[in-house]
Amino acid sequence: MSLRFLLDTNILSEPTRQHPHPVVMKKLQEHEGEVATSTTVWHELRFGCSRLPDSQKRRFLERYLTQIVRLTIPILPYDVEAATWHGVERARLMGMGKTPSFPDSQIAAVAKVNHLILVTNNVSDYQGFFDLDVQNWFQ
């Protein structure tokens, strides 16, 4: 199978919730082998986990990240091609008076240059990016 989707932080976090959203879980199973994430999302996940105090929850999340996410989901880099698209797109959006967050812009760039559909629960964070396909698996 080839990659089709780039998962945002809130999608990759969903399986760790006490009561994960059933549609998200179904989609993750349906599209196993077709999903990737970005180094920016990996950073957000590791940062969030690392800020937690030493606890059972933190150890659970660390295992999830290292034994599930890291081993089963490709983590695509924010590379020169993504940085180029990001720079041009950020300038265009700022010229229109819009200022998307830098990390969200990086995630959008990785999805765009890899021709992937960005999957997120925060669709509004990605509105305005030129020709970016976005899906919300929570709906």
Where are these regions (language model features)?
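Short, well-structured N-terminal submotif of metal-dependent ribonuclease cores
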Residues: M1-T37, S50-T66
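Acidic, PIN/NYN-like endoribonuclease modules and their adjacent C-terminal/linker elements
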Residues: S2, A108, K112-Q139
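Active-site neighborhoods of divalent-metal-dependent phosphate/nucleic-acid chemistry enzymes
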Residues: L3, F47-S50, P74-V119
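A generic structural signal for short hydrophobic patches within well-formed alpha-helices
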Residues: L12, W42-L45, A83, Y126
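Residues that scaffold the ATP/ADP-binding catalytic core of kinase and kinase-like folds
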Residues: E14-P15, G48, H86, F129, ...
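Residues at the C-termini of beta-strands that transition into short coil/loop
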Residues: T39-V41, D79, N122, F138
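Short, hinge-like loop/turn segments at secondary-structure boundaries
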Residues: L52-Q56, R92-M94, N136-F138
